[in-house]
Structures are given as structure tokens and as C-alpha cells.
Curated annotation (Swiss-Prot):
EC number(s) per entry: 2.7.1.130
GO cellular component: plasma membrane
Superkingdom of the source species: Bacteria
Name the record gives this protein: Tetraacyldisaccharide 4'-kinase
Keywords carried by this UniProt record: ATP-binding, Kinase, Lipid A biosynthesis, Lipid biosynthesis, Lipid metabolism, Nucleotide-binding, Transferase
């Protein structure tokens, strides 16, 4: 957590300066790898249907999952049959694997399970995205567009459209590549992208801004929708890429927090994690709720979040998809 906080400060922390040689090695390796794919020296899989990659150039939360959910739901409304592929971080395997709504987060991964339940779309997970795309084609021949969650740097899978998410609040941090900074690829990558989309405000590189808004509240133990009594005091936990955003959102909604506790992204929650938080009702994200349902109390609640796609973005994206579908790939 300390390291991530330092990454998103404007100046390079003196201790992080010691990591800059490793960042240069990271830059060399990733650029060579990308060049090999671009030159055809490493094989790439081309799916029979258009592939939309939703990714980012930095680590940490940039709103990819809400974007994938919103994109999938909108495409279904437009008559498309989207399928989602993802890495399945934390999933047990074997891979590739098609996620079922009845799966546990331990089996399928927290984010793929959330996307499966929220969208109703088929979801296939595999560390190698090309394998996931192949299984999707085999199991779901009616799928006519594949949405690849967090696959920007997975060049073994050819893509037709890239949607790069950027957090307008934190931007590109100190501008350094891993491990001295938060970047998987340099800011130059944004200039060559089809679509750069910011959330939580405008960013200089972004063509479109997506509003991410808090949704409804539900009980963690049974998913029953509730009206939260905001006059109470609450404790909050978050095991996501940027926990402070969740806590800030609660405060902006007029919710009084007595305690807030951050955990690492994809944290595997246990009942012991809440031993010091039992004095008040507990609030958490939808992503974390799935991992706490088996031991949740009746006064534990989670909130959904909704990404609102701009109309001009929908129009342009639909036109581009139709063009790709008609053979311009």
C-alpha cells in the first residue's frame, strides 16, 4: 500500500529512485516483446469476431470492470451477443474455464464472477487470453463480439478496438514504469490508441469521459436490496485497486464512517479480517461482497457502481463495430 501511494505522487520518492534501473529493464523487455508481436516474430491469435480490449497502462483501479459491465449490457440492448474473457486473477483453474453464476470467487476469481452475474454474458477465464477466446468460440458460436477485460498488454490476442481507461484523478502517477512507478507502458501508448477514456473527470489524453456513479445497496448475506439508513455510523472495508475512492464516495453520499480499512486488491477475506469492526454495520464494494457472503452478518452491505457511457461514444463505437463486423479488420 505504501508503494502504491508513492507511485501516485508527482515526485519520485528517493527510495523509488533505487528501483529505476529495474524500470529501465522492464521498459526494454516490454518494448522488445511488443515489437516482436508487431513484426510477426511471435504468433498472434485472430478471433473470427471483433475483439474489444478494455485495459489500462497503469496498475490499480481505473474503472475497467464497470466499463466492461456497462459495455456488455449496452451491446446486448443493441442486439449484439457479447462474450467476456478475462485473466481470472485468483482463480484456481484449470484454464481456460467458463465461469458459472454458481461458482465461488475462489474458483472463478472475484471480477469474472461479478461480470458473469451482472451481465448474464458468457465469461471465460485464462491467463492466456487467446486460449479464452478460442474456448469462447467453441462453446458459444452465437457470440459476435468479444470483450477482453484487462488485456491491453496481452498482444498474443489480436484486437480490433482498444479502450484504454485512465483515472483522471491520479493520471499516470510519477510517470515511471514498474517497479519505480505504476505504469505497465509509457504515456506514449495513449497517443496511438483508438479510444482513451477517463473517469472521475477529464484528462488531457482522453477523448471521452465516463461517469461512474454509485448504485443501489444490498445485503451481503442474501443480496436483498435495502434502503441504507445513512444516519447510522458505519465501518467500511475495501480490497480493490484504489480503496480510498470507495471511502471518499461513501463520505460524499453523506455516510459517516467510524473506521475504514484497506486491503490489497483481490484480497481473500476471512471472518478474522472483521474482528475489530463488529461495533458498527459494515459497508463494502460489490467485488468484495462475493468473498464475504458465506460469513456475512445481516448488517453488512455492499453498493453497486454504474458506468454511464456518453451517447457520442456509443454512436462512434457502434459504427466502428459494424465496420469491423463487415470485414474491415
Amino acid at each position: 500500500m505504501w508503494l502504491q501511494k508513492q507511485w501516485y505522487k508527482a515526485r519520485l520518492h528517493p527510495l523509488l529512485f533505487l528501483l529505476t534501473p529495474l524500470s529501465l529493464v522492464f521498459w526494454l523487455v516490454t518494448n522488445l516483446r511488443r515489437s516482436f508481436y508487431a513484426l510477426g516474430l511471435m504468433p498472434r491469435y485472430k478471433a473470427d469476431v471483433p475483439v474489444i480490449v478494455v485495459g489500462n497502462i497503469s496498475v490499480g483501479g481505473t474503472g475497467k470492470t464497470p466499463m466492461v459491465v456497462a459495455l456488455s449490457q449496452w451491446l446486448k440492448d443493441e442486439g449484439w451477443n457479447p462474450g467476456i474473457i478475462s485473466r481470472g486473477y485468483g482463480a484456481k483453474g484449470p484454464f481456460p474455464y467458463e465461469v458459472l453464476e454458481s461458482d465461488s470467487p475462489e474458483k472463478a476469481g472475484d471480477e469474472p464472477l461479478l461480470m458473469r452475474r451482472r451481465t448474464g454474458c458468457p465469461v471465460v477465464i485464462a491467463p492466456k487470453r487467446a486460449q479464452a477466446a478460442k474456448l469462447m468460440a467453441e462453446q458459444h458460436p452465437k457470440v459476435d463480439v468479444i470483450i477482453c477485460d484487462d488485456g491491453l498488454q496481452h498482444y498474443a490476442l489480436k484486437r480490433d478496438i482498444e479502450l484504454i481507461m485512465i483515472d483522471a484523478e491520479r493520471g499516470t502517477g510519477n510517470g515511471w514504469l514498474l517497479p519505480a512507478g505504476p505504469l505497465r507502458e509509457g504515456p506514449w501508448r495513449l497517443k496511438g490508441a483508438d479510444w482513451v477514456i477517463s473517469n472521475y473527470g477529464r484528462h488531457a489524453f482522453a477523448r471521452h469521459v465516463v461517469d461512474v456513479e454509485p448504485g443501489n445497496w444490498y445485503r451481503v448475506d442474501n443480496n436483498e436490496q435495502v434502503a441504507l439508513k445513512t444516519e447510522s455510523k458505519f465501518n467500511a472495508v475495501a480490497g480493490i485497486g484504489y480503496p480510498q475512492r470507495f471511502f471518499n464516495s461513501l463520505i460524499e453520499q453523506g455516510i459517516e464512517l467510524e473506521n475504514s480499512q484497506s486491503f490489497a486488491d483481490h484480497h481473500a477475506f476471512s471472518q478474522q479480517d472483521f474482528s475489530n469492526l463488529a461495533s458498527n454495520p459494515i459497508l463494502m464494494t460489490e467485488k468484495d461482497a462475493g468473498k464475504c457472503q458465506s460469513f456475512a452478518q445481516a448488517d453488512w452491505y455492499y453498493q453497486t457502481i454504474e458506468a454511464k457511457l456518453p451517447e457520442v461514444m456509443k454512436t462512434n463505437l457502434l459504427a466502428e463495430l459494424e465496420r469491423k463486423k463487415n470485414g474491415h479488420r
